[in-house]
Each structure stands twice: as structure tokens, then as C-alpha cells.
Regions:
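Short cytosolic juxtamembrane segments of multi-pass membrane proteins
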Residues: 2-5, 14, 396-411
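Generic structural signal for small/hydrophobic residues in well-ordered secondary structure
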Residues: 17, 45, 53, 63, ...
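Transmembrane helix-loop junction
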Residues: 47, 164-165, 356, 360, ...
Length: 411
């Protein structure tokens, strides 16, 4: 019996009992849908986590000033000066060669305007090397230079949203922007940065689109701040590739704690650790979802085996007749195995459609990122086919061992 003919007969037999076949496929449909949904959610979450962490910097250690009420700050300032440029200098003396340290300070302002518009942006004072640490891309002009900070130049770089609010479709480079009482000249515009989330593993991540960057030295020299306010809001330590992040994070924490007299007024964030925590959470999620999907596939496999055993019993006369006219045992076994495989693959195809719909719904309504890849589809279909083969072997062997004489006498 040719293989193509066996496939044709298998499909014909299944179509004779449409309802029974459909009910048998349900377990495979839900199992494959669960597997595909799990893989798509896992892939989407992994992609999003990596994207967010890359924006924070995989080789960075972040030192952030903690937020307190003003009265609490007054008490804390009796012992700790908060984050200052002295911390930057102290870290530079103990950290390995090749380490880059960048400081950041936000200026609270309510007056940002150009001749064409207004903006409600954050004003951030940073050094000239900050784009390397924060993965910022300049698409118009350039970032300001180290000399701009040293000479306290009043220059600025705009985020994409800030540029649109202040200048619309008009040119921005070389144009003045008023920040409180001071005028700054625009020297650059940043690329649009899309963030699907503003928080990751409890750590806040800010989009740069509405930010305006000015030299840190200019900000500290020309804008007043409250006596209890931190001189710096954040210090980014960019470590060389050959350094252990956990080990250096401990050194950084110890050094800053000593300059702050062991006052807990700062936090240490290691993006690489956050990525590992996210992956660990995702592994647990995949394990739970995998167990649920396995149960559904197991039920589907048992359903296939039951229906195929019933089919063997129902078609005993047919088996005997085929054996009598020359069909071999392996032809009979292959016939029933193909029917089991056809049920599982049909269920897999419908399961892929259902799983894709579930993934799309999760992305739309729950806001979770999902990614369906060719590998995940092949894996889901492969698992389904394997289940069909495994649970179809016993009925196929039983059918192939039916005695032709007994089969023809069976009623």
C-alpha cells in the first residue's frame, strides 16, 4: 500500500466521524495553544527585559539618591551630605582602570519656553560622556563637549518630544530655549526612544523623549538648590568587561556608605541582576505553564488512544478483509498510526491558530509583550505530533496483530 494512499484512507476514515474526531482533537488543540501562548509570552517578556536593561546599561552600576520628606532630609543631613561630586572622586580612586563614572542632577523648573512653544520637560545636568552610559543617540547636531561644562556654557540637547513641543516642525539647532531665567542654545536632538514600560523589577526607568540635557557644571553653578537637597541625584558607574559586577557593586556600596557615615540614603541598582531576576521569574512561569500544557496534551493523547482502540474494534472486519486480500501487518499498523498522527496534527494546526489569538489578546488587553516565532510554532507542532505517535503506537500494534481469520468471523 502506497504511503499517499494510506494518508488518503486515514483522512477519509476520520471525516466519516467528524464529531468524534473533533472531540478527540480538543485536548491537542488546548495543549498546543497553551504551549504556544507560554512560549510567545516568555519570548516577549525576555525581549522586553533585555531591551529595558540595555537602556539602563548591562555593564552599569547605578547609585541613586533615595527620596525623603524635607524634615527627614534635615535630620539625615546632620550626618550624611547625600550624593555629591565627592562620591564621584572617591569612587574614581578605588575602582579599576577603565571605569567611567557619570553624574546626573535634575533641576526642578516650571518655565521652559522657546519663541514658538512651551514644554513641561525634565531638566537634567549631565557630563559630556553621559550618552555612552545611558545609550542615547543624537540624530541632529551633537551632544555638548567637555569644554562646555568646564566653561559653564549654556547649551542644551533636546529629547524628541521636547523638541516637538518647543519648535514643532521648525529647525531647532542653534535656536534659544529659556529655562527659568537663563537662555540656552540647542546643540543637539536625541533619537526617539520607545519604552513599553516605565518600571522594571521595581526600578523606575525614565524615557528620554521629554528630557532636556544641559552641562552638569552649568546647572550646579547657575541654579540654586535647597540646602538639604542632594548635589547629585544619580551616579552611573560603567565598568570594564573584565570586571565582576557583583564584586564591584559591593565595593561601590561600601565606599559610598563610608562617605555617607553609613546612613541609608542611597540605593544600588545592578541592571544585570535585574535581568537575572526577570529570567528566574520567567523560568518559574514557563515551568508552571509547561505543566498545565503537558496535562492538556496528556489528556489529548489518552483521548487519541481511546478513540483509536475503539476504531480498531469497530473496524475488525475491515482489517480482516484487507489482510485477506494481501495487506501486510505493517500496512495495517501504519494505517492506524497515520490516523492518530492526522488527529494530532489537525489539533496542532487549530491549536496554533488559538494560541496566536490568545497571545494577541494578552498583548492587547493585558499589555504584556508577546512574540510568536517560527521556532515556537515548530516546537508546539512537534510536541503534538510526538504525542500523537506515542499514543497511537499501541492501537496500531493491536490492529496489526488482529488475526485475519478471526477478524472475518467477527461480528
Amino acid at each position: 500500500m502506497f504511503f499517499a494512499e494510506s494518508v488518503k484512507i486515514a483522512l477519509s476514515n476520520l471525516l466519516l466521524h467528524k464529531l468524534r474526531t473533533s472531540l478527540t482533537m480538543l485536548g491537542m488543540i488546548f495543549g498546543v495553544a497553551a504551549v504556544l501562548s507560554m512560549l510567545s509570552i516568555g519570548a516577549g517578556a525576555g525581549r522586553e527585559a533585555l531591551s529595558l536593561i540595555q537602556k539602563m546599561g548591562l555593564r552599569n552600576v547605578l547609585i541613586r539618591a533615595k527620596a525623603f520628606e524635607e524634615e527627614e532630609l534635615r535630620i539625615i543631613r546632620q550626618d550624611s551630605p547625600g550624593l555629591t561630586r565627592h562620591d564621584v572622586q572617591a569612587l574614581g580612586q578605588v575602582l579599576p582602570a577603565g571605569t567611567r563614572i557619570h553624574a546626573k542632577k535634575e533641576h526642578k523648573t516650571y518655565q521652559i519656553a522657546s519663541a514658538l512653544g512651551r514644554a513641561d520637560s525634565r531638566i537634567l545636568g549631565v557630563g559630556a560622556g553621559y550618552p555612552l552610559a545611558a545609550n542615547l543617540e543624537v540624530v541632529e547636531g551633537s551632544f555638548f563637549l567637555p569644554t562646555d561644562g568646564l566653561k559653564r556654557h549654556q547649551v542644551c540637547v533636546l529629547g524628541k518630544t521636547a523638541r516637538r513641543k518647543l519648535f514643532g516642525l521648525n529647525p531647532a539647532l542653534g535656536e534659544p530655549v529659556k529655562i527659568d531665567a537663563l537662555w540656552f542654545i540647542v546643540v543637539g536632538v536625541l533619537a526617539d526612544q520607545l519604552l513599553e514600560k516605565d518600571e522594571f523589577e521595581g526600578v523606575k526607568i525614565e524615557s528620554v523623549n521629554n528630557d532636556i540635557y544641559i552641562p552638569l557644571e552649568t546647572l550646579l553653578a547657575k541654579y540654586e538648590r535647597k540646602p538639604v537637597e542632594n548635589e547629585l541625584d544619580e551616579i552611573i558607574v560603567q565598568l570594564p568587561q573584565d570586571q565582576d559586577l557583583s564584586e564591584q557593586a559591593a565595593v561601590i556600596s561600601g565606599m559610598v556608605a563610608s562617605t555617607h557615615r553609613n546612613i541609608d540614603d542611597f540605593s544600588i541598582v545592578v541592571p544585570e541582576r535585574l535581568l537575572e531576576q526577570s529570567r528566574q521569574t520567567q523560568r518559574i512561569f514557563n515551568l508552571v505553564m509547561g505543566a498545565i500544557a503537558s496535562i492538556s496534551l496528556l489528556v489529548g493523547g489518552i483521548g487519541i488512544m481511546n478513540i483509536m482502540l475503539a476504531s480498531v474494534l469497530e473496524r475488525t472486519n475491515e482489517i480482516g478483509l484487507r489482510r485477506a486480500v494481501g495487506a501486510r501487518r505493517r500496512d495495517i499498523g501504519r494505517q492506524f498510526l497515520l490516523e492518530a498522527l492526522a488527529i494530532s496534527l489537525s489539533g496542532a494546526a487549530l491549536g496554533v491558530l488559538l494560541g496566536s489569538s490568545i497571545s494577541s489578546a494578552v498583548s492587547t488587553y493585558a499589555g504584556w509583550p508577546t512574540t510568536i516565532t517560527g521556532v515556537s510554532v515548530l516546537l508546539a507542532v512537534g510536541v503534538s505530533a510526538s504525542v500523537g505517535l506515542v499514543f497511537g503506537i499501541y492501537p496500531a500494534r493491536k490492529a496489526s496483530r488482529v488475526s485475519p481469520i478471526e477478524a472475518l468471523r467477527y461480528e
